[in-house]
């Protein structure tokens, strides 16, 4: 008979292997401008199928993909936003440390936009 873990103890690592991506955080979906959505599904996909593949689902806006790639993850949920929504919190060449001292977000992956920018409240984020 296979050995079972004692009650109250988790099974050994690797005993259960779940595949599939995780549902993205709400801000990564709701802050995406509908006109910038990149399709992530197929016609007739359900919200469950979409979320299972790590994508966002919103059927409220006609004429754009309902299952779409989320905005890039950031260190903090309040730093997730469209690049166009960034409000400058620093100066050209600011270091991540100086930006953090200002309690602002830092991302230097896109040129020609503020790299140090004010966070946004997560109150408005939803699926």
UniProtKB/Swiss-Prot annotation:
Q: What is this protein called?
A: Trefoil factor 2
GO molecular function, a single term: CXCR4 chemokine receptor binding
Cross-referenced InterPro entries = P_trefoil_chordata, P_trefoil_CS, P_trefoil_dom, P_trefoil_dom_sf
Q: Which Gene3D superfamilies match?
A: Spasmolytic Protein, domain 1
Q: Report the residues modified as Pyrrolidone carboxylic acid.
A: 22
- Organism of provenance: Sus scrofa (Pig)
Alphabetical UniProt keywords: Disulfide bond, Growth factor, Pyrrolidone carboxylic acid, Repeat, Secreted, Signal
Among PROSITE patterns, the record links this protein to: P_TREFOIL_1 (PS00025), P_TREFOIL_2 (PS51448)
Q: List the disulfide bonds.
A: 27-125, 29-56, 40-55, 50-67, 79-105, 89-104, 99-116
Originating gene:
TFF2
Q: Give a brief account of the tissues where this protein occurs.
A: Found in pancreas.
- Asked if Metal-binding is a keyword of the record, the answer is no
Lineage summary: Eukaryota, Metazoa, Chordata, Craniata, Vertebrata
This protein's GO cellular component annotations are:
extracellular space
Q: Which residues form the signal peptide?
A: 1-21
List this protein's GO terms for biological process. Answer: chemokine-mediated signaling pathway; maintenance of gastrointestinal epithelium; negative regulation of gastric acid secretion
Please explain the role this protein plays, according to its UniProt record.
Inhibits gastrointestinal motility and gastric acid secretion. Could function as a structural component of gastric mucus, possibly by stabilizing glycoproteins in the mucus gel through interactions with carbohydrate side chains.
Query: What's one Pfam family here?
Result: Trefoil
- Where is this protein chiefly located? secreted
Q: Where is the P-type domain?
A: 27-71, 77-120
Q: Where in the cell is it found?
A: Secreted
């Amino acid at each position: 008979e296979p050995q079972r873990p004692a009650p109250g103890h988790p099974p050994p690592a690797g005993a259960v292997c779940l595949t599939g991506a995780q549902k993205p955080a709400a801000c990564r979906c709701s802050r995406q401008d509908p006109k910038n959505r990149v399709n992530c599904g197929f016609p007739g996909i359900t919200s469950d199928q979409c979320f299972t593949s790590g994508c966002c689902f919103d059927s409220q806006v006609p004429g754009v993909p309902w299952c779409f790639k989320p905005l890039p993850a950031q260190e903090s949920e309040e730093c997730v936003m469209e690049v166009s929504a960034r409000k400058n919190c620093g100066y050209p060449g600011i270091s991540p440390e100086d930006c953090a001292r200002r309690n602002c977000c830092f991302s230097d992956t896109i040129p020609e936009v503020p790299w140090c920018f004010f966070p946004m409240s997560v109150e408005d984020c939803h699926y």
